[in-house]
């Protein structure tokens, strides 16, 4: 299972050793992401199975065929300051004073418009319709997670006055209990599970209303694994994907997903 991991150094050495011990064994591999995009685009289906793929269903095909629900995908302007700084640098580097003045006026107008745009509290209030639902919140690291949790009263109070916050990360001895409590919590509170490098793959939680992406990533694998936590086969309700950091902008997987759906 998850045979793409055989491309990693330690996993790969162990896989080769195991195959040498069992040369006559019949080998079956399962994965949702056979291509290791951040490892020179290595296709582990080619390396391990010589391209013998018995069955292949893309995420787009699964959505079109109704196996997985079509999510409600929401993006935000949460990180617009970084974009404005990048655009300001480009304007400053223009050589023509006239062109620079015109572009500066457009940029200033954009800055004023963004400053008046809804904050995350308004975004969450509007889009989180299941006020007592369960949401997985993906964070980059412990410091980042602590910062995001500190904003819970500010960001989620208009969704639900009562919020249950759970934390899950590998170095925390209380993770197993927190994860179990999150899964069994049937209260009327809004349930938020903040996690770091967990629940990306191999673990699926039933009854998830959506995911909130606070972790920037350029990996299509991590991106699909994270949004996949909101997609459960057979569900009829549209799960919510709140892409706060706009991961979709830097990933070719979005255009790829559109292509998969059109082809299906």
Regions found by a protein language model. Give the residues of each.
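Short glycine-/polar-rich loops that comprise or flank the Walker A/P-loop
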Residues: 22-26, 50-52, 68-72, 161-164, ...
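Interdomain helical connector at the RecA1-RecA2 junction of SF1/SF2 helicase-like NTPases
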Residues: 39-133, 149, 153
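Conserved segment of the helicase C-terminal RecA-like domain
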Residues: 229-257
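SF2 helicase catalytic motif II
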Residues: 1-36
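Conserved Walker B
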Residues: 2-4, 199, 215-217, 230
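Conserved helicase ATPase core of P-loop NTP-dependent helicases/translocases
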Residues: 136, 146-147, 152, 159-200
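SF2 helicase motor core recognition
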Residues: 66, 192-211, 227-232
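A short beta-strand-to-loop transition that corresponds to the Sensor-1 phosphate-sensing loop
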Residues: 2, 30-34, 141-142, 196-198, ...
């Amino acid at each position: 299972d998850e045979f793409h991991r055989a491309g990693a150094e330690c996993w790969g050495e162990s896989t080769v050793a195991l195959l040498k011990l069992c040369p006559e064994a019949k080998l079956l591999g399962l994965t949702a992401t056979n291509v290791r995009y951040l490892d020179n685009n290595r296709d582990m289906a080619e390396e391990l199975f010589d391209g013998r793929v018995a069955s292949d269903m893309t995420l787009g095909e699964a959505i079109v065929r109704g196996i997985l629900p079509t999510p409600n995908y929401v993006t935000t302007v949460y990180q617009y300051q970084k974009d404005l700084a990048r655009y300001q640098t480009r304007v400053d580097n223009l050589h023509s004073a006239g062109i620079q003045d015109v572009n500066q006026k457009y940029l200033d107008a954009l800055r004023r418009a963004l400053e008046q745009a809804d904050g995350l509290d308004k975004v969450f209030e509007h889009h989180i319709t299941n006020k007592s639902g369960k949401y997985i919140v993906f964070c980059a690291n412990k410091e980042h997670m602590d910062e995001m949790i500190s904003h819970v009263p500010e960001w989620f109070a208009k969704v639900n006055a009562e919020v249950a916050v759970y934390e899950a990360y590998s170095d925390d001895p209380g993770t197993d209990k927190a994860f179990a409590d999150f899964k069994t919590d049937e209260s009327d509170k809004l349930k938020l599970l903040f996690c770091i490098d967990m629940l990306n793959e191999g673990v699926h939680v039933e009854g998830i209303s959506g995911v909130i992406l606070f972790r920037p990533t350029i990996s299509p694998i991590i991106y699909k694994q994270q949004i996949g936590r909101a997609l459960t086969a057979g569900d009829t309700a549209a799960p919510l994907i709140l892409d706060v950091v706009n991961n979709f902008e830097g990933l070719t997987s979005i255009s790829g997903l559109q292509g998969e759906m059109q082809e299906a």
